[in-house]
């Protein structure tokens, strides 16, 4: 970062499909390279989270509600490994309870996307009421 004269925050988005051991090693590198924070999480390739077995063969990663529990588990692990690093909680946030859960698991910030697409801008006031 110093070589590039770059001062904006740098976050790394992690996969919820990585093992706890791999996440621990990644967190060591995040600290070594002075990343500003982590994002929990990217999409998952775990299609067993889908209720419709026909959809399990589809390509691509899962986001939204199917990602909620896995992203929360990763967020909890990240917070245990480093409670001081900034964490952005992502994945399956549709209700105030979902939002609060991310914060309670250690998220400094919460990102919404799928709920914004499906419910529109009013989701923001719904989450913050």
Language-model regions, residue ranges each:
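Catalytic cores of alpha/beta
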Residues: 18-32, 78-83, 93-110
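Glycine- and other small-residue-rich loops at beta-strand/loop junctions that grip anionic moieties
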Residues: 15, 63-67, 88-92, 113-116
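Short beta-strand/loop segments at the ligand-binding rim of alpha/beta enzyme cores
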Residues: 2-16, 78-89
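Generic structural signal for well-ordered alpha-helices
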Residues: 1, 23-28, 72-76, 99, ...
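Glycine/Thr-rich beta-alpha phosphate-binding loop at enzyme active sites
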Residues: 29-85, 123
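Glycine-rich phosphate-binding active-site loops on the catalytic face of alpha/beta enzymes
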Residues: 37-45, 93, 99-126
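Short amphipathic alpha-helical segments, especially helix-boundary/capping motifs
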Residues: 2-4, 49-55, 102-105
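Extended mid-to-C-terminal alpha-helical interaction segments
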Residues: 11-15, 22, 43-51
């Amino acid at each position: 970062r110093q070589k590039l004269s770059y001062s904006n925050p740098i976050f790394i988005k992690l996969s919820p499909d990585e093992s706890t051991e791999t996440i621990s090693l990644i967190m060591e590198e995040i600290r070594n390279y002075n990343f500003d924070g982590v994002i929990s999480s990217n999409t998952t390739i775990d299609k067993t989270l889908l209720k419709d077995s026909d959809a399990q063969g589809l390509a691509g990663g899962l986001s939204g509600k199917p990602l909620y529990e896995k992203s929360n588990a990763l967020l909890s692990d990240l917070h245990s490994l480093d409670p001081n690093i900034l964490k952005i909680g992502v994945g399956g946030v549709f209700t105030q309870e979902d939002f609060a859960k991310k914060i309670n698991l250690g998220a400094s910030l919460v990102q919404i996307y799928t709920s914004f697409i499906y419910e529109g801008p009013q989701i923001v006031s719904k989450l913050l009421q």
